[in-house]
Amino acid sequence: MNQHLRHQPIPFIDTAAQRQRLGKSLDDAVARVLAHCQFLGGPEIIQLEAELAAYCGAKYAVSCSSGTDALLMVLMAQGIGPGDAVLCPSFTFCATGEAVALTGATPVFVDVLEDTFNIDPASLRRGIATAKRLGLKPKAVIPVDLFGQSADHDAVAAIAADEGLFVLDDAAQGFGASYKGRRIGTFGLATATSFYPAKPLGCFGDGGAILTDDAGLLERLRSVRAHGGGSDKYDNVRLGLTARLDTIQAAVLLEKLKIFDDEIAARNVVAERYTAALADVVKVPRLVDGCTSVWAQYTIRLPKGVDRDTFAAALKAQGIPTAIYYPKSMHQQTAYRIFPSADGGLPVSEQLSSDVISLPMHAYLDEATQGRIIDVVRGALA
């Protein structure tokens, strides 16, 4: 291989390639918004919400300003507050627990499964018992579809039904994935997702959405999204937020949605190549039978004895970026140590935080470039 190409940096996520592919269609979509000047609540918002709902098979979609606000809006609309407990995995991005804490409720952290990185049903049951022992009222569970693969929604739903909890699916990384033949977006009371630019379906700024089949929740969410407003603009009926998605972002998402399935297929090809080439030297993620992933990340686990920082430095020296999702689980972070964890501890979350590392993953990663990544990974572990 040419020495220059060997060290030429590889993008971790290639948004520029996607931008080039969409080209004039994106320019025209944004230009239409600039022409009609309906920057909030424009026709693209209505169209996007309809298309998101149809894509997932949900009755309703509510666009909003971020994936974090999507979680928070549902919790607020459901009246979650002080004295309540909401169960969520610790091994995830902080927004999951943050949204709970912002309502005044208590996040109770539970463990995950080591091969899928998703919520462990047994730990969930222990977490519910922990919450009750502490005098809290368990009200909800937030499973996370981490790294693009769905949680075990049947198991979560069964536990939630037994305990009288509602389920809020955190699909910030899992929009477009499927579980047992059903697309994410129809499990539980509601699904929250994110359109952050690095997500599989991302806009050109912050954005998010909520999917639900519950008409009553739909109306409350629309109210919460705009300061808790009611029929009289200046007589707010509940506490709310400023959480609208702007029309330019909706226009961008409508164009990206047109190529989304094609990009998911390409991501799966990339994931399959990684798995085939690396399964003998690292622990690769397990894709559950009957499920599909959108591969928001391709996260591997390094063998015992391999120093993660040294490994990452070896790849960086060859122009290959890596990322660590997540170096600390939520219960280990300064702001969240005060909140309880399920009895028995969270050993899997803690172990994952010490040995996971993510490789470049996007729909435009060609076979030759990926081959270079694979060769360097194997060389760094030799």
What does each model-found stretch correspond to?
Residues 37-85, 99-101, 109-111, 137, ...:
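Phosphate-binding glycine-rich loop
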Residues 115-203, 211:
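Active-site phosphate-binding strand-loop segment of PLP-dependent enzymes
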Residues 1-38, 43, 360:
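N-terminal "arm"/small-domain region of PLP-dependent enzymes with the aminotransferase-like
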Residues 2-3, 16, 45-50, 58-59, ...:
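PLP-dependent aminotransferase class I/II
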Residues 104:
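Structured binding elements
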Residues 92-97:
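Conserved coil-to-alpha-helix start sites within the AMP-binding
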